[in-house]
Amino acid sequence: MCGIVGYIGPQGAAQILLQGLQKLEYRGYDSAGIATLNEGELLCVRAKGKLQNLVEKVEQLDIVAHVGIGHTRWATHGKPEEYNAHPHRDSRDRLAVVQNGIIENYRELRDQLQARGHIFRSETDTEVIPHLIAELLPETPTANGLLEAVRQAVHQLEGAFAIAVICADYPDELIVARQQAPLVIGFGQGEFFCASDTPAIIPYTRAVLPLENGELARLTPTGVEVYDFEGHRLRKTPRTLNWNPVMVEKQGFKHYMLKEIYEQPGVVRACLENYLRADWEVASPFSPVQLNLPPSLLDNLQHIQIVACGTSWHAGLVGKYLLEQVAQIPTSVQYASEFRYAPPPLLPHTLTIGVTQSGETADTLAALEMELKRRQGLDGALQPRLLGITNRPESSLGHLVPHIIDTRAGIEIGVAATKTFVAQLMAFYLLTLELSWQRQSCDRSRLAELVTGLRQLPAQMEQILESQERYIEALSHDFWETQDFIFLGRGINFPIALEGALKLKEISYIHAEGYPAGEMKHGPIALLDAKVPVVTIAMPGSVFEKVLSNAQEARARDARLIGVTPLDEAEAQHTFDNLLPVPEVDELLSPILTVIPLQLLAYHIAARRGLDVDQPRNLAKSVTVE
């Protein structure tokens, strides 16, 4: 959601803040602003709309400052107007705050502050914070005056938040605090940074320290001090990220999304190299997979429950199919936002898997935390077993759950998930292989077939990209004015139909729905006519003939049919008006391939419509509020 950056050091703060905000644009925003300190004065510059509007304002000013904070806002409280943009200031314009999150008790705090004479200039929940801190500052600056004022203020805040604070009376300090919202500190040479996410500081340093819940820190030109909310000094050591600045550049692609679609074969290849044992054979006495998960996590499982949101939920649906059909473990998949308020009965020997690409999705974290709390203290069979699947092991998820499958997809900038979705699918394939081996639920020769098929996927993915993109780009010209799409799939490819529909609606703003192909006659068929294209995933296997039959029902209603299917299937060629060919593979492995043409179709339709593919309206890459 919102993005925070902060800097203190010898360089010009304004440009570093603006460059950091540019790296956080992918999180989604509707306004932006920075605040800097120079010669005892606080300067705040804000702008509605795109970050370039702020850049143009800043360029008109001669800002000489070595400490500052910046923010991209995604509106939650108050309209997306300049007066609601961050940073927010106290009544004397001496103190500025940026915040990511939601202050749940802000109305109560605002009423109290107004009764004491404070004047508010925005509709936001954030503005209560600078007023609270200002009240708690000593009249004369003291050694720990700002730090202590922030510490006391956060005790009055309810909700999830990350904040950064600067004050004209404390020109050599930048204070940050975290509670249920991400914040990371970067360590440079005589300079220090803070940000909501690491891409903002990767150009300057790879030494980072993610703050944990209930922690605050003081950044000065000489170092970083970390404290808990009770004021106790903590010993913390930064870690080194295995990233570099090139990973967050477009590298010649028009959009990050297209670049990330093309990175998918490499993501799958890296995942296989990291987790699939090259020396495994059918007769080997060891598992084909090395996930480094303790036996206690997976032994005697009777049930698996998956919690996730959005695209990660679709990955969970594919995971459910694999875990039930191959590993033979009953599995449920729930939206994390629903799980929290209607949790299922506690069942013994249950593994709970949280799936989130960012590791910061608020609903998923809250669902996992609730599951942890309601099982703690119960007898052995009901003890919590938690596993996370994420692209960011250093995230809040990595601190919450004891075990992680790192999808190793690298930073994803485009708001619409592509390579991280495929990486999540790979995590479920690998987990399924591990459980199948342990439980002996699958014949070894069948396991060998799946392992061989997985190893062939990267080359097959590259084949699709090389052979299909130009055709799909040309095909997209037929649909740039289309108002509705239907996506159909069955079995393990039903979630891919859902994902294809989600991608299209996210970035092209075209209404699209995904359905199980067998459900067409139970309602969706009423929507069909010559103006509603139907995209159908038809892969040879257990439901191939059924899917083609369902597609014929759509043809009878004059719908234009687009088929994701192998090229050499004669019956499919006669059924569909347009083919998006994919190699014929084992039906269980097909989702990795069938999703690629759907990603490309969504991308090219959106690009043809002249839309901002990487930053679609109203969406955020990392949804850090409930």
From Swiss-Prot:
It is found in: Cytoplasm. The keyword Repeat applies. The keyword Translocase does not apply. InterPro entries: GATase_2_dom, GFAT, GFAT_N, GlmS/AgaS_SIS, GlmS/FrlB_SIS, Ntn_hydrolases_N, SIS_dom, SIS_dom_sf. Residues 293-441, 471-616 form the SIS domain. One of its GO terms (cellular component) is cytosol. This is Glutamine--fructose-6-phosphate aminotransferase [isomerizing]. It comes from Thermosynechococcus vestitus (strain NIES-2133 / IAM M-273 / BP-1).
